[in-house]
């Protein structure tokens, strides 16, 4: 009985020491990857006057809906997302400009098309 109590005390002491050591380990106070990226983006936006662009570009998007499984973007535009009828969530993008709905029965397909001009 005395040996068991001694082991129990030693085990508890060891667990307490390990817990205290974990508390003493330095923690990264810089933050998460998300906060670091956010900080860098803010820095770049704050300094954008240092690097003025001579070209002004606009980002425009439109949705193209077609019957069947395929919906294609107009020339010069790229697919950024797809939606399919009958609650089908299985689709892929072909050649960068066409949405292909993969479900067996399909009544419509929509392609979200964007361009930077």
From Swiss-Prot:
Disulfide bonds join 61-114, 73-113, 82-99, 84-101, 88-103. Residues 1-29 form the signal peptide. It is found in: Secreted. InterPro entries: RELM (IPR009714), Resistin-like_sf (IPR036262). GO terms for molecular function: hormone activity. Its main location: secreted. GO terms for cellular component: extracellular space. Induction: Up-regulated in colon and bone marrow in response to a high-fat diet. Also up-regulated in obese mice mutant for the leptin receptor LEPR (db/db genotype). Expressed in colon, lung, spleen, pancreas, ileum and bone marrow (at protein level). In colon, found throughout the crypt and surface epithelium, including goblet cells (at protein level). Highest expression is observed in bone marrow, spleen and lung, with lower levels in other tissues. Detected at low levels in granulocytes, but not found in monocytes or lymphocytes. Has very weak expression in white adipose tissue. Keywords: Disulfide bond, Hormone, Secreted, Signal. One of its GO terms (biological process) is myeloid dendritic cell chemotaxis. Belongs to the resistin/FIZZ family. Probable hormone. Promotes chemotaxis in myeloid cells. Homodimer. Heterodimer with RETNLB. This is Resistin-like gamma. It comes from Mus musculus.
């Amino acid at each position: 009985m005395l040996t068991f109590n001694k082991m129990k005390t030693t085990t508890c002491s060891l667990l307490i020491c390990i817990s205290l050591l974990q508390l003493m380990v330095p923690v990264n106070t810089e933050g998460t990857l998300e906060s670091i990226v956010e900080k860098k983006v803010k820095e770049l936006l704050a300094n954008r006057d240092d690097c003025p662009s001579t070209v002004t570009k606009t980002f425009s998007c439109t949705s193209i809906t077609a019957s069947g499984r395929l919906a294609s973007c107009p020339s010069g535009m790229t697919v950024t997302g797809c939606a399919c009828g009958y609650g089908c969530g299985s689709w892929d993008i072909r050649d960068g400009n066409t949405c292909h709905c993969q479900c067996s029965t399909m009544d419509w397909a929509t392609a979200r098309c964007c361009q930077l001009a």
